[in-house]
Amino acid sequence: MELENYEQPVVLREDNLRRRRRMKPRSAAGSLSSMELIPIEFVLPTSQRISKTPETALLHVAGHGNVEQMKAQVWLRALETSVAAEFYHRLGPDQFLLLYQKKGQWYEIYDRYQVVQTLDCLHYWKLMHKSPGQIHVVQRHVPSEETLAFQKQLTSLIGYDVTDISNVHDDELEFTRRRLVTPRMAEVAGRDAKLYAMHPWVTSKPLPDYLSKKIANNCIFIVIHRGTTSQTIKVSADDTPGTILQSFFTKMAKKKSLMNISESQSEQDFVLRVCGRDEYLVGETPLKNFQWVRQCLKNGDEIHLVLDTPPDPALDEVRKEEWPLVDDCTGVTGYHEQLTIHGKDHESVFTVSLWDCDRKFRVKIRGIDIPVLPRNTDLTVFVEANIQHGQQVLCQRRTSPKPFAEEVLWNVWLEFGIKIKDLPKGALLNLQIYCCKTPSLSSKASAETPGSESKGKAQLLYYVNLLLIDHRFLLRHGDYVLHMWQISGKAEEQGSFNADKLTSATNPDKENSMSISILLDNYCHPIALPKHRPTPDPEGDRVRAEMPNQLRKQLEAIIATDPLNPLTAEDKELLWHFRYESLKHPKAYPKLFSSVKWGQQEIVAKTYQLLARREIWDQSALDVGLTMQLLDCNFSDENVRAIAVQKLESLEDDDVLHYLLQLVQAVKFEPYHDSALARFLLKRGLRNKRIGHFLFWFLRSEIAQSRHYQQRFAVILEAYLRGCGTAMLQDFTQQVHVIEMLQKVTIDIKSLSAEKYDVSSQVISQLKQKLESLQNSNLPESFRVPYDPGLKAGTLVIEKCKVMASKKKPLWLEFKCADPTVLSNETIGIIFKHGDDLRQDMLILQILRIMESIWETESLDLCLLPYGCISTGDKIGMIEIVKDATTIAQIQQSTVGNTGAFKDEVLNHWLKEKCPIEEKFQAAVERFVYSCAGYCVATFVLGIGDRHNDNIMISETGNLFHIDFGHILGNYKSFLGINKERVPFVLTPDFLFVMGSSGKKTSPHFQKFQDVCVRAYLALRHHTNLLIILFSMMLMTGMPQLTSKEDIEYIRDALTVGKSEEDAKKYFLDQIEVCRDKGWTVQFNWFLHLVLGIKQGEKHSA
């Protein structure tokens, strides 16, 4: 594309220069003067001839200059004075690092554009009364073969090469890699090596009443194993593992030989581990607070522990860092007083404050270039340019329409209605290409508002974003050719559009993508966004004192609304005017910060004054839903997001796991790669292996599926992998290797059976051959199960493996348990899927776990069974096979064939067969009642559809559970244009029969079912906002069933927001009656499901 030459750069007017020369320099209180010359001693890489000591150069460096200029000054001095001047002629400054020492650590002065007076070393030297400070000039080292091999291993684990900078228009990726070294090293240095090696899974939440009742006299029996011997001991639920070991060794003092314990060994040499699992009970936590113990109590299982030697912490050794540290001042600019041009001679100006730039922001749209034109060439195109902050569009302009061709040139300046000084950090220049059949727009560049009618029926084709203020706080300038993202026609990809359109990454497919050429104003000097200095807000007390009663009530009503309730312009004005009153109510924070006009620098400054006075927020109890709201796509300001992350610091590990899925998604809404949230995830992953395990898979899955955020997730994952330790790296390598091999087998098997549902004997034979070949060659001896890191799978049990009768041909795989201390011969069953996106199933299963935790606070155990499920790549994943469970369809068919769907007594008879002892049968019925109630409430609130007898299962102990969550939030399936879902949830006559109820007759079990349903439903209503927020944060992940706020409205309606408790109770009881009245319609659907020949196999979540 031929582009015209750019006009002369913007220059400062002579009268302004003269005026500034007359003004005296000013300095910020307590900071270096912007005009100050700073003495620094530089230790050079060359040595003196006689003494052989390093040469030094004492320079007086301008505080307002940048690091690059300081480096050039050093080079000039070295060229003039060094005895090895030829060395400095031969090598340039870019081949050297600037290092300084702080508290025994070497730090690199990394950012070449950083203003000298903002360097951390200056503040450190001042604190230490050291003048002049010393900076070492050190030659960059060439990476060793070992380093390159390690980076190659990391690239394989990440699934993306973070060293490839071919698709970046700045150095943010490398900049972030370096910035994350410091928090990583701090976390690794501070973690307890022994606890990290054993990663106990604990909680500090009180034991629910229903579990307390299962502990008689606060005592628990545990079985301790050693070799082939075991010993049962009685302990207190409040005992710590250390106390239990001490008691056990006292009891076994004369019987050590029976347990294969030498006389010299004591309790100090052992730890307690769960039999068959990599799950340790260590630390000062009471026994009742270990999650595994609670799980055993809940399921009525015995607690079996093995007396084991602790793992060697050396196995978690972290590879030594080859990079010097960079401090947190890297990339930070000075205050406005330091950067301002006012009071400086123009020869002394090196960096200019953004707040001095009073002109309006503009961009020159040069043109677009597309490799292949669309089929319909009778089109016109135009460019729409928005400046936006989060979801808030600050201003908009667009070009005139022109005929669509391979090359379209405009060469037109678009001037925005926002001044450069008002551009907030995180502001995006959003460029979008629209096309329409007829030129419905004015031929001149216009300034329409978003959504204006003049856009007519224009269709969005391409988009790309550019951060206007980069990761160094510097205003972008000059030429850019940006490769754009195409709007996908695939429904599953359209769901992620709202998140994707926030990315600042460009399309890596440069050869086949649309490119747009733009020009931003050039300047004589870098333009830097200054740091905000906290100052008092004179309006604060006056505004607070003036609030009338009526407006106070109005404000409280706005604050009380749920997150889906849109704020009117009047609401926003009221919230902002009475911002200091709003500050008293933590629930107001998301609404208050949504009311900020981020395109006005004065307003932003006042917002930071508010944030400085957030004592009530800091002291308030953690409300996860509220805090997560501040991390959604509506907030781009790093300070607002930082107070949310700060609040999350108090989350215990188990809760971090609960919300990890959303927290990883929230990283997409950060404007920059390095953020408080990214550091929080990194820190918690490095602190706890269980969190680290899931963080690895959640990030890796996103890297594989989200091209728009590959770089961001990759740089966080690399930072984690560099600090997780050798043992974790080996585990991940094994897991990735297994998945890659199984993926290849699945693809081969699918190619043999095409898209058919049935599975031929030839296909089964081929599978067994391929698995045997795998077992004999490349399959690791053991690997950690991705959805359950406590389990290690061993060799395949090939005779039990099969191809499932489903369109995508998932593999039913069974492995031996690799842990020799496992007590049973049960295999580890895994369904390996290729071709389905499991992220929606993961979300529903995660929400079910959160519902469980909500119900636990009400002392309700609804026996949910959120089985293991994890996405491990692009439409690849694993699902846990629940043991001793079968589908309702199989039970019905095995008895009387397809008509079993109409036989009310079939399920009850099957349960009696499995539990022939009356006591066990009654316990199974009780479990059935509670689990049925739990899934009725959960599936109703989440709008889970397409419920049939092949995706509802039951265990041999009466635990009902649902699988396959392809239709959620009321997006129900239809058959021949008719909605199949005629009931709010599944409560069929055969379910009622198990409860002793039929027709309209009641029973004690049915009454209990109703009571439990109502309690569970009302408990969820108290957490409506949390559920709404969790789904809102997943809106932009690409799930076809979760694409708009209208989808989430379903939850609000299902939970009857706005109704009284009594009305809500009546509403849910009415839903139960609807199910009883129309249960026959469900049975008829189930009958059709069987008759139409939909294959069952041993289908589970397939």
Swiss-Prot record:
Record region (Catalytic loop): 943-951
Sequence ranges assigned to domain PI3K-RBD in this UniProt record: 217-309
Biological processes, Gene Ontology terms: angiogenesis; cellular response to cAMP; chemotaxis; endocytosis; hepatocyte apoptotic process; immune system process; inflammatory response; negative regulation of fibroblast apoptotic process
Observed phenotype of the null mutant: PIK3CG-null mice are viable and fertile, and display immunological abnormalities when the immune system is stressed. There is reduced T(reg) cells amount, reduced levels of IgG, enhanced IL12 production in macrophages, and increased T-cell infiltration in the gut. Leukocyte migration in response to chemotactic agents and towards the site of inflammation, as well as neutrophil oxidative burst in response to chemotactic agents are decreased.
Pfam families documented for this protein: PI3_PI4_kinase, PI3K_C2, PI3K_rbd, PI3Ka, PIK3CG_ABD
Domain C2 PI3K-type: 357-521
Disulfide bond annotation, renumbered to this chain: none
Annotated function: Phosphoinositide-3-kinase (PI3K) that phosphorylates PtdIns(4,5)P2 (Phosphatidylinositol 4,5-bisphosphate) to generate phosphatidylinositol 3,4,5-trisphosphate (PIP3). PIP3 plays a key role by recruiting PH domain-containing proteins to the membrane, including AKT1 and PDPK1, activating signaling cascades involved in cell growth, survival, proliferation, motility and morphology. Links G-protein coupled receptor activation to PIP3 production. Involved in immune, inflammatory and allergic responses. Modulates leukocyte chemotaxis to inflammatory sites and in response to chemoattractant agents.
Subunit structure: Heterodimer of a catalytic subunit PIK3CG and a PIK3R5 or PIK3R6 regulatory subunit. Interacts with GRK2 through the PIK helical domain. Interaction with GRK2 is required for targeting to agonist-occupied receptor. Interacts with PDE3B; regulates PDE3B activity and thereby cAMP levels in cells. Interacts with TPM2. Interacts with EPHA8; regulates integrin-mediated cell adhesion to substrate. Interacts with HRAS; the interaction is required for membrane recruitment and beta-gamma G protein dimer-dependent activation of the PI3K gamma complex PIK3CG:PIK3R6.
Name of the protein described by the UniProt record: Phosphatidylinositol 4,5-bisphosphate 3-kinase catalytic subunit gamma isoform
